[in-house]
């Protein structure tokens, strides 16, 4: 039983050739067969099968099936789902269960989705390799000695291994797109505010956005259409109308499309294989009628510097709530309240999370606020202005998703700065808040996936996914099984 597109599965379910229970049983068996890969932090065996039976009964009663009827979906372990464990892949949330549903979860449940489990991630979404996880790393589906990317590495690996049809992730600076590129799947980060953050555990609140990982752009668009939209429980969610994404995609033509290609996305030190595969993909767009336009944008290195100042500052504030007093891990060897706070956080957080909390506290401290935090906010505004100007000349901006292919497990753990550069091409879209997607376009000389990164103007997800779908079809890539 294998379906690379949800519409194929849906037709089998609605025609009664298959039942939801049969489908979910198959997916759960696959998940169990991959348990040694650490892809899931929790598997919802009983709940998923019970939900499948409920949906089968609904169809038997002749009731209208939802948009996502019977779709097996995985959830990153930082998105709340009532009654399910929620750990953010951290020791400090050991034993915690969600007490409410995220808005995205509510909306998917209302459309008859079935959740099969929670996926592994970098602790509190801080990382680019999925190695910063309390339960261990996830191997890349194409080479088990390499990383799947991060922080949504488990979600990307789950889709690539066909353990679910779609997975939710979160994207702060590239955490959906970079693992999408590393695992040969579509990784979508929508416009900031397009999807409610209610129920998403906060890392950096002015950057965080729930995203979608899928085998193809159609399934990503379908899920986006369900979970997008304003939410009274999230003041940053946008009132911008949610369009029919699939219809918008169908009306996208490559003929005359202006594709901006910034020199900043093709530096001299870019991996040669990555550069070759990406340029070949862009050439296919050009051959199909698009116009490649050279544009100038600020160097991505400035975005990385500003990004890591701003997100660490926000993280130091957001993670102050994890203190061992109300939920999660509490240090057993604490003679007083102050010691309990210190010991619980010291023992509960991993090295990378502690590094970012300390850095964030430093840049917000007296004497350094103007030098670092204020200056980074100014850089952010410059990027926003320059990207707005760029979209007066082009329809989409394209480049590599990552400066290098999936790297070996352990290769960059001793060099945080080198690890941070994995997001050098994805961070600019996060700084400006524009939608972006990684789409599979080919493989390097070792057979490792390479993705093209597309950025569109605010709320142009439909157009962007239409371009991505055309590009994926031209390159004829398919996820690993």
From Swiss-Prot:
EC number(s) from the headed UniProt entry: 6.3.5.7
Key words, A-Z: ATP-binding, Ligase, Nucleotide-binding, Protein biosynthesis
Active site: 76, 151, 175
InterPro entries linked: Amidase, Amidase_CS, Amidase_dom, AS_sf, GatA
Pfam families, per the entry: Amidase (PF01425)
GO molecular function terms listed in the Swiss-Prot or TrEMBL record: ATP binding; glutaminyl-tRNA synthase (glutamine-hydrolyzing) activity
Reactions mediated catalytically: L-glutamyl-tRNA(Gln) + L-glutamine + ATP + H2O = L-glutaminyl-tRNA(Gln) + L-glutamate + ADP + phosphate + H(+)
Cellular component GO terms held in the UniProt record: glutamyl-tRNA(Gln) amidotransferase complex
Protein's GO biological process: translation
Enzyme class label: ligase
NCBIfam families recorded: gatA
Function: Allows the formation of correctly charged Gln-tRNA(Gln) through the transamidation of misacylated Glu-tRNA(Gln) in organisms which lack glutaminyl-tRNA synthetase. The reaction takes place in the presence of glutamine and ATP through an activated gamma-phospho-Glu-tRNA(Gln).
Family: Belongs to the amidase family. GatA subfamily.
Subunit note: Heterotrimer of A, B and C subunits.
HAMAP family, sorted: GatA
Protein name in UniProt: Glutamyl-tRNA(Gln) amidotransferase subunit A
Source organism (scientific name): Chlorobaculum parvum (strain DSM 263 / NCIMB 8327)
